[in-house]
Amino acid sequence: MSVDNESLYLYNLTIKHPSSCIASIVGQFLGNKKSQEIILANSTSIELWKADSNTGKLEKIYQQASFGIIQGIDKIRLVGTQKDYVVITSDSGKLVVLEFDIEKLQFVPLFQEPHSKNGLRRTSPGEYLCVDPHNRAILIGAIEKNKLVYKVQSNDEGKLELSSPLETFSKHTLTLQICAMDTGFENPMFAAIECDYNARQQDNGEEEDAGEASLLLNYYELDQGLNHVVKHKSNEKIPGSSSHLIPLPDFIGGLLVCSKSTIIYAHPSKDKLYLPIPIRSNTNETLIVNHVIHRLKKNNFFILVQSQLGDCFKITIDHDEVNESIENINITYFDTIPLSQSLNIFKSGFLFANVATNNKLFYQFEKLGDDNNNTTLQSCNFSDYNSIFELDISKRSFKVAGLENLALVDIMETLNPITDGALIETLRPEVPDPFKQLTALSSHSYLKTLTHGISTNTVVSSPLPIKPTAIHTTRIFAESANDEYLVISSTLSSQTLVLSIGEVVEEVNDSQFVTNEPTINVQQVGKSSVVQIYSNGIRHIKHTMRNDTIEKKYTDWYPPAGISIIQASTNNEQVIIGLSNREICYFEIDPHDDQLVEYQERLEMSGGSISALAISSSSISKLQRKSSYAIVGCSDETIQAISLKPHNCLEIVTLQALSANSSSIAMVPHGYSTSVHIGMENGLYVRVTIDEITGKLSDTRIQFLGSKPVQLSVIGLPQLQQNGLLAISSRPWIGYYSKGDFKMTPLLNTNISNGASFYSEDIGGEGIVGIDDNNLIILTISNTDGEESGLNVNDDFIINSVKLRYLPRKMNVDSPGDNEISSSSYIYIIESEYGITSPFPVTVLPDNQKESTNENIDTPEIDQDYYDAFGFERSRHSWASCVEVIDFNNQEIVQTIELPKNESAISLCRLQFESQQTKNQEYLIIGTTQDQKFLPNSYSNNYLYTFTINKSSNKNKSQNEILEFVHKTELDYQPTAIIPFNGRLLVGMSNFLRLYDLGQRQLLRKASSNIEYLKNIIRLTHQGGSRIVVGDSSMSTTFVKYDSTENQFIPFADDIMKRQITALVTLDYDTIIGGDKFGNIFVSRVPETISQQSDKDWSLLRYQESYLNGSGSRLKNICEFYLQDIPTSFTKGSLVMGGKESIIYTGIQGTLGLLLPLSTENEVKFLGDLQLLLRKYFDYNFDDFDKDKNGYNLLGKDHLKFRSYYNPVKNVMDGDLIERFYELSQSMKIRIGTELNRTPREIEKKISEMRHRSAF
């Protein structure tokens, strides 16, 4: 590919996929009859989860990116089989049937049946998807006009087969909902709520009121004999508020039509029945949004429906099987859970709630609500539709209560919707290196902090009598399950302390260890011996079991006089030591009597003193009990591989230079290869692969772990069926293999300075024992709540949440100075929520007088737990809004300022006014609007609130006095964007830019400029000097300069296309990055000549004529990329210490990703060519698919078209696609590598390097 040297090239990586799931389905996708799995589908990926019926926990099995937009998902199964397939509709224009391949651990497409053009259109089938309950047919429908039906059958080989689609269409018809009816052995039938918009128009051309107009309930029958779809028009119309259909089991037939506060039973050949829905007290209506049907034994079943407020109702039906008629339909209040997109019930008695705007929840049924005494309504009391509304509201209202029938057992952390995000870098006293955390306003009323790492749970913390410097663990017998000795060494006091491990940790007095010298290493060798290596020798202790007692007999080995042991490495069969005279001594264990047998020759290292030494541990590799090589680190900044094979023992086979001295080395086999892990004194960690035959070192990977020397030790990870690595620098890390790559992840909640692997059944299995100052620490790797031991490799983040009052909109991070410890980092958050009434008193008075926000106000006691569970009281066209201050380090709210009723906070910024004599006094400005309504948008008043920030006096004051109210200023338009600008406040409102300074009673307007061709300014960013960039809601971005002589803001360059801006950030003086509401990310730059004129020849550029309803010049479009998520924030920074600065973005559906700038022309060409080859490999043409030459394209969507959905992708490499290189077979990797003139290992190294430059 050709490369423009003056352009910018980016590499996109998705760090966290969207968590907003459009649907969830439960089935037996693994083919196991005794277990069920659940599939979650978001717009761009599908996830497979498994529920543990014993613990009630959900475990992710697999996640697969779709590289397309998923519209609908359902399941289908062939008769006589026990495995479910997945049916998906998407923007690829194909109906896709997937099977989960257990061997490959991925979803594999069985069919990709094209039915329409690529893309999303209202006439393209795919918006609706439903499968016949008896798996005989699949219907896909468009929003308007078209529907397709596929017959499902099995071929001669017993495999699933789809027929050609049968089409049916209705002119001028909009489809609102479709469901598949259960007709038993009759022809498959589907029901749809539809609207004939042509008939809705009156003769005079006016339209009926949508709320009063009726809808149609039409039936579509697949005549299997005639192979034709027949449309049955309904004779009676249904209410205009009808929005949900619930099909009933075949022995009853028909369906339930859910409308506003009403349920209607409908059947093509039976009379209708009417049932009112209970209404929550203090509300006016109930709308059913989703349901789940659960069948019990025989013909028993119940329906669980959920309302728009989250209230769940249980519907049961009294059916007369003799007369085949319904006697009664009953509905009663069940429980209240968060509003969900879908509900799923497992056979094991669990309920999964696919919550729409919060964490997904997993419940267990405690009971079925049969003894519920709350409001119960029955259809037998109502003869027609109008009789429902004659019922007194008090007889159908109910009060919500805590969970009675359900018990919460697991929480699946999600981030959607993210409204704002930031990267915060803090310093902590216990860790000298910066600590990076992502914060996001997400999940409806939460501030979520994402920390890269794995949580730990401290089991034991005990002081020690000596100052420890190293710690070791060992068994006594080879067949022992638990570690029995804990050996603590101190070089400061030249002591060794031996502790026994059991129910109580206590000192051992008869261990026969040398205790008056520091221990270098301890190892169980042979069958029943232990080796202690200390500075002046090796003690071999043999244990013999006689008469239930253990006899101990020891022998000693001493180095030559005046020589000491400085390094050692051991396994069950081998011992190798490094002496102070630079000699290497090698021992093997006699298998008959466990004695040490020294190799007659010694090797003198020529590269300086020995700084590190390692051999492979036999406990890791059972196939090869002895290590073939030893790795020696020397003080001349080299490592050398030494053969331990019989024919060339102690012969140097490889030498490799390092950038610093090695401080620790470990060898860990994995699969058919062995990795050499090197910790260095400069804080770098290096991983290389050693060839088992030649001993050559290759495939070097480097990562920065901290500012202190790196110490390594091998630990057991039985839950991953592998051994991992514990690396300790300025903070501890754990290394393990995941998804084909080795990952290093920090350990949180601990600050151990030395550690070792530790196994004990008393702590539930494998753990880590370490030293923290003078304390002995025993910890386990656990989940976030510390309840169970286990390493979750599917999530790189630990999420901590702070509950907020209302829906958060924007935040401003107030970080301390570079030399400060972050004990006073605050986050200021504006929150506002529509359609609710707040119970909290106003703490900012509505007049313009200066009032303290911290006066003692007598407030009634507010049940916060009630509002957290059930939400605030609903009220039309009402707003509640507040400002909250979060102490970031302590993760707590320190101040809340409730704004006046019906005011909504929409913008904020923090600045210092240059006109003020008080130096370093910061102000927080909040922009609000009053009585805002939508469709059409209207408001009554707009204000700017001014607060002082009193951080410096916080130590002597109550924490509630961080913000103090100064005054408020009335505005003409909504202050949708505010930023500091050269010591003043710049406000974007409507199409005006106004400059304000601080006054005594209000803000003083200093300048006002009207940019005529703009519509609504919603984003502002300061480029530096007098230049700003304006982001408009429909007119994209415009570069503007402040002319101080005329006191005006004058535009001089704007975008080449119209965009609906949602996020905007400065990259440099001439360049910006932005996102729009259609999911695009773009980078724009001012042409160099225009930029120079704006600074040097402003008089020429100032009076240029407008061009095509814009400024006289246009920006240059550098990058273009489609995300399929609306960007809400951009932050410049790195997610790892010492990483390269990149652009971190968040998306409203919960997406986290980064855009990494590429450095060299060769890098751009290589990644561009690799991306092109992978596009060809994952070809979207399924008809010509060859599994030896192609990879599976999940949805059959062309990757280039996906990333170019609205505009052609430009100068952005898709790292998500490139990382699929790991999935390729070895032969395909070689073939692609040949075309790129690279080996597969070189390509994998480059892909890994790209990720670790700024991420993990």
UniProtKB/Swiss-Prot annotation:
Its main location: nucleus. Pfam families: Beta-prop_RSE1_1st, Beta-prop_RSE1_2nd, CPSF_A. It comes from the Eukaryota. GO terms for cellular component: spliceosomal complex. Signal peptide: none annotated. It is found in: Nucleus. Keywords: mRNA processing, mRNA splicing, Nucleus, Spliceosome. Coiled coil: none annotated. GO terms for biological process: mRNA processing; RNA splicing. GO terms for molecular function: nucleic acid binding. Involved in pre-mRNA splicing and cell cycle control. Associated with the spliceosome. Belongs to the RSE1 family. This is Pre-mRNA-splicing factor RSE1. The gene is RSE1.
